[in-house]
């Protein structure tokens, strides 16, 4: 994915004419220097574009209006270099619909103790200019992020870069189209929800296409294209004897390749970047898409099983956020437990569809084995274990009056034994703070059995996501205590009830 190449972030300097043209000239010089340095040295995911100074209400309003209508603009970074009276910002901020970050910095790192005078003081007023800007944001109840630190500080760079990822993700989400092949798994509650409310809140659209429409595209794929893709499989994966040429399951691999090519063509033609399937709605497909889904996820598509469009959309969003970061992000399900005093574990997996981006093996195993659900031919799938280390699992649920994001911090561990009879990819983890507390908190908060698993993102990333989209977040980590967690759920009911 090269999605960050499609966007830029505008760097806006707030000032005023009170200090005279010489001060404004120096402000402009400083801004040019800082933007050039950040673009060159800070390893930001997006390019910063310096805009003209905002020194009057009309100038500021024009910048905000232009940002709204420029599809390449993912958001604004504002630096209050001098004091910039915040009433000048009201009209612009009222209309601004792009993410906003205040960079609370100043050009100099150290004070020039021997030479500091009032000219220096008037030029470098971030300390109180930023507070004036912060007041108007609070007064207007406008969500915006704040990063404090010198512009050469690596931690400030990382925080700005993290915010940029969120800003780009939000713009991508506004254009996201989710395709559901078939409907929801019958009688399942948590995977359903209000698609209209989701489009109003997040911007992504969700619509259903008959599986027959997909089958028509799958059947149009040429044998030559199928064989070329299977050649790619041969080079990327460890093929079991049954899947190799003349193997008894070779035809199943060919059919999986045809499904992958058909799915990708369908998604590309429709402009979809997330999709769902369900094993109860496979009419015309010879097998449940497993290998196809795994590979499409690795290419950046969002996915969830059983018609779970919220998790599919969340996976796409988190894939965009984590583009270029170390570690993978995948669809996941809490499947079964290992209870052992002091070593409780969760085994996560799904019927087939776990993304290879989280695999520890360089070449996962490609195999075809029986699947007792769905009533179709044995499906192809990739089998692998997961990288170890800190990770998160996240779930987005519809509570009717609002959306709630649940995040559990986890520690992925190595599987202590081989799993010779488990023919699916899997992840094994310890839930924070412990399995009883984590599972009870998750259940009390209504968390889904489907999640997005990520090594690339962390809790701070998901907090930013929730803040930027103005949704509730509940966190389960090493600091979680059930009595306080229950209290927080009750307080949230009151808070969000008042906001209706």
Curated annotation (Swiss-Prot):
Claim: Oxidoreductase is one of the keywords in the record: no
* One of the protein's GO biological processes: L-arabinose catabolic process to xylulose 5-phosphate
Q: Which residues form a coiled coil?
A: none
Name of the protein: L-arabinose isomerase
Instruction: Identify the Gene3D superfamilies for this entry.
Output: 3.40.50.10940
Reading the lineage from the top rank, the first entry is Bacteria
Residues annotated as binding Mn(2+) are 306, 333, 350, 450
Q: Report whether Cell cycle shows up as a keyword of the record.
A: no
> What is the stated purpose of this protein?
Catalyzes the conversion of L-arabinose to L-ribulose.
Pathway named in the protein's UniProt entry: Carbohydrate degradation; L-arabinose degradation via L-ribulose; D-xylulose 5-phosphate from L-arabinose (bacterial route): step 1/3
So what does this thing catalyse?
Answer: beta-L-arabinopyranose = L-ribulose
Q: Which GO-annotated molecular functions does the record name?
A: L-arabinose isomerase activity; manganese ion binding
> PANTHER family per the record?
L-ARABINOSE ISOMERASE (PTHR38464:SF1)
The gene name reads araA
Oligomeric state and interaction partners are given as: Homohexamer.
What does the sequence similarity comment in the record state about its family? Belongs to the arabinose isomerase family.
Which cofactor does the UniProt annotation name? Mn(2+)
Co-factor: note: Binds 1 Mn(2+) ion per subunit.
Q: Which UniProt keywords apply?
A: Arabinose catabolism, Carbohydrate metabolism, Isomerase, Manganese, Metal-binding
Q: What is its EC number?
A: 5.3.1.4
Any one GO CC term of this protein is: cytosol
| HAMAP family named among the record's database cross-references | Arabinose_Isome
């Amino acid at each position: 994915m090269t999605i960050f190449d499609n966007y830029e972030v505008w760097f806006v300097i707030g000032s005023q004419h009170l200090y005279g043209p010489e001060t404004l000239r120096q402000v402009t010089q400083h801004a040019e220097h800082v933007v050039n340095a950040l673009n060159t040295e800070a390893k930001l995911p997006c390019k910063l574009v310096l805009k003209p100074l905002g020194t009057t209400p009309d100038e500021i309003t024009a910048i905000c209006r232009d940002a709204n209508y420029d599809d390449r603009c993912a958001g604004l970074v504002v630096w209050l270099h001098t004091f910039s009276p915040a009433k000048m910002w009201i009209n612009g901020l009222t209309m601004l619909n792009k993410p906003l970050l205040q960079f609370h910095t100043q050009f100099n790192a150290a004070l020039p103790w021997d030479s500091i005078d009032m000219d220096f003081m008037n030029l470098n007023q971030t300390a109180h200019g930023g507070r004036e800007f912060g007041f108007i944001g609070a007064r207007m109840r406008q969500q915006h992020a704040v990063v404090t630190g010198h512009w050469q500080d690596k931690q400030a760079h990382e925080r700005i870069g993290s915010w940029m990822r969120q800003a780009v993700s939000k713009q991508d989400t506004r254009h996201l189209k989710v395709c559901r092949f078939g409907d929801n798994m019958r009688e399942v509650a948590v995977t359903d929800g209000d698609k209209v409310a989701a489009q109003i809140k997040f911007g992504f659209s969700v619509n259903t296409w008959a599986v027959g429409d997909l089958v028509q595209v799958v059947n149009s794929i040429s044998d030559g294209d199928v064989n070329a893709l299977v050649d790619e499989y041969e080079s990327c994966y460890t093929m079991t004897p049954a899947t190799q040429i003349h193997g008894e399951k070779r035809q199943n691999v060919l059919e999986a390749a045809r499904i992958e090519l058909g799915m990708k063509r369908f998604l590309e033609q429709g402009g979809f970047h997330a999709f769902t399937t369900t094993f109860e709605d496979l009419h015309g497909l010879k097998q449940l898409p497993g290998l196809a889904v795994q590979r499409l996820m690795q290419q950046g598509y969002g996915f969830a099983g059983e018609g779970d469009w919220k998790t599919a959309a969340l996976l796409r969003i988190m894939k965009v956020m984590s583009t270029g970061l170390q570690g993978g992000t995948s669809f996941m399900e809490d499947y079964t437990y290992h209870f052992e005093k002091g070593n409780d574990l969760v085994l996560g997996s799904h019927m087939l569809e776990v993304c290879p981006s989280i695999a520890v093996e360089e070449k996962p195993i490609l195999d075809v084995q029986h699947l007792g659900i769905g009533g179709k031919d044995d499906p192809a799938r990739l089998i692998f274990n997961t990288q170890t280390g800190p990770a998160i699992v996240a779930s987005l649920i519809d509570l009717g009056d609002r959306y709630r994001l649940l995040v559990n911090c986890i520690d992925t561990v190595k599987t202590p034994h081989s799993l010779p009879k488990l023919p699916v990819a899997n992840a094994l983890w310890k839930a924070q703070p412990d399995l009883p507390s984590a599972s009870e908190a998750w259940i009390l908060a209504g968390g889904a059995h489907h999640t997005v698993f990520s090594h690339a993102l962390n809790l701070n990333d998901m907090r930013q996501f929730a803040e930027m989209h103005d949704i509730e977040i509940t966190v389960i980590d090493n600091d979680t205590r059930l009595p306080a967690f229950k209290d927080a759920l009750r307080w949230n009911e009151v808070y969000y009830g008042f906001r209706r």
